Every structure is written in C-alpha cells, then in structure tokens.
Regions:
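C-terminal regulatory/interaction module of P-loop NTP-utilizing enzymes
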Residues: 1-302
Length: 302
C-alpha cells in the first residue's frame, strides 16, 4: 500500500478512495500483439530508461514506428507493471488527478492516472507510466505532470499526497509526434525540461526492409517500388506538399492486405494501393498528387 499524508489544511476534506484494480496492471497481463524487431539501439536505450526509472524519457518520432509495442514488450519481458491509458486533446484534470463518484454505497474518490500510477508502482515495486502522444494535451493540463516528473515524484489528489515508497520505481515514458504534424500541440518548455529522450529518424529503406515480412511479395514489382514510394511521400511531407507520410505500420498493412487478396481478386496490386495507401490522404489535391506518384512508381493505372 502507498503512503498518503495530508498536504494542505486548506484543501477539501478527503473522502474514501476507491481501491485500485491492480490485476489490470499486472505484468503477466500485458498484451504484446506481435514481435518487435529493433532497427538500431532503441530497444536497449528504452529498456535502460524503464529499468532505471531515474528520469522521465521522451520519444519523438513519426507515427507507426512501434513505440507502443516496444514499451509493452520491454515491460512484459522485464516483469514491470504497465499503466497505459489514453491521454490527448480531451484529457482533463479529473482524468489525471481523479474525481468524485457516487454509487449505491455512497460518495467515493476515483484516482486519476497520476496517483494511480504511483499506487501501482508501490504495489508491484516497479511500474511504467506510458503516455502516448502526451503533447496533445492542452498546456494547462501538461502542467499537472510537473511534480510527478521531477524530484518530488509525487502528486496531490483527494487532499492527500501520493508518493513513491522507498525502493519503489516509477518509469515515465512519453511519446510525441514531430511538431510538423497538423493539429499537434507543442510540449511545454517547463515539462520538456524534465525529460531526457531520443528523436527517432524516419526509417530508411534498409530499416523498413529489415523489419517487414516480405514473404510472397515480388521484389521488383512491389517491394522496391513500395519502399521508393514511402521515401518519396516522406520527402513531399517535408516540403509541405502532403500532411501524411507512410509509416512502417502502413507498409505492414500493405503486405498483409496484398497477401490476403492476391489470389482472390483481379488487380490485387492496384486494389492494395488504393485501399492501403490512397485512403490515407483525404485532401483531394494531395490524393491526386499521390495517385500520380503511385502510377509513375509502380507503372500501374489507378
């Protein structure tokens, strides 16, 4: 059980706190949906950050590069409890700190993500709080992370201070997209100063080639032009011509989808290009630009 002490006499008198369901954070219940294949030393570095839990760790990268899978994999392999709940534009103070709930037994306080994570760490001895796309939170909400991300390692909720017990660890991992993403909030300077971390580059052709299953995929007709298309679209994004770049996840979708339909329909290549690549671009001018690139790269007609 975690230590809780009164923080401020002027704070509202606390009410009974609902118990945390620790089973859902138990390392044995962590879901790892596929194998993570490292590209460089990113698994080693993140493993060190999670195991040491000394400083919050930030990963900045394009979408679809396996950040969530890697975090799940590391926690599962090292038997570290994982707290992974959605945060983003709609995240409110009550989501992070907690809120009152009324049921047939009375009024209770339901812990939010931050004090709950401390409770989980104290229960298991070591936990990881994973915040995917954390910078999408409003700046006022990001400020609520300050005390748990610095030397205080604590948070006040329901009139009590939740703090790590001696010998217990809480790793805090955030992932964010580059600020070039449309609609992405920036991470505040005050919060970013509390993190160390790494920026993952957009994967090269050799990176993508090494982590994707190319079984039954023609090298000349599909693999080589698909890798070329991915790099071309990324270059278009850097120039501001499109807002979307193909990720490793997109290419995995393509290979899976193509294998599924190749013997079932006519023109499976054109269908896969339409249903996996073209569908990612919603703006008409962008879609037309990508269509022309696809036709030129694959020598097909869409």
């Amino acid at each position: 059980m975690s230590k809780t002490i009164m923080k401020d006499k002027d704070m509202e008198t606390s009410i009974p706190t609902l118990a945390v369901d620790f089973d859902q954070y138990d390392p044995k219940n962590i879901d790892v949906w596929e194998e993570y294949i490292p590209i460089g030393n990113e698994k080693e570095r993140l493993t060190m950050a999670i195991k040491s839990a000394n400083l919050p760790y930030l990963i900045e990268s394009e979408k679809g590069q396996g950040k969530t899978l890697l975090t799940h994999t590391i926690c599962k392999e090292n038997k570290i409890a994982l707290v992974n709940e959605p945060i983003g534009v709609g995240t409110k103070k009550s989501d992070l700190i907690g809120s009152k709930e009324i049921n047939r037994d009375g009024t209770f306080f339901s812990l939010g993500l931050l004090p709950k994570s401390i409770e989980v760490a104290n229960h298991f001895g070591h936990a990881c709080l994973y915040g995917d796309e954390g910078s999408n939170q409003e700046h006022e909400v990001q400020q609520l992370w300050h005390s748990i991300c610095d030397g205080r390692r604590s948070i006040v909720a329901n009139g009590k201070q939740y703090k790590l017990n001696n010998g217990c660890k809480l790793a805090i991992i955030w992932t964010i997209n580059p600020v070039t993403y449309a609609g992405v909030n920036s991470m505040t300077e005050a919060l970013r100063s509390r993190f160390i971390g790494s920026a993952w580059n957009y994967p090269s052709n050799s990176d993508m080639e090494s982590v994707i299953d190319w079984t039954d995929i023609s090298i000349d007709l599909i693999k080589t032009p698909l890798l070329t298309l991915a790099q071309d679209i990324y270059a278009l994004k850097l120039k501001g011509d499109v807002e979307y770049a193909l990720s490793i996840r997109d290419l995995v979708q393509f290979t899976h989808h193509y294998r599924e339909i190749q013997d079932k329909i006519s023109k499976p290549l054109e269908t896969a290009l339409n249903e996996v690549v073209m569908i990612k671009f919603s703006e008409p001018a962008e879609r037309e630009l990508i269509r022309l690139r696809i036709e030129d790269t694959f020598d097909v007609k869409l």
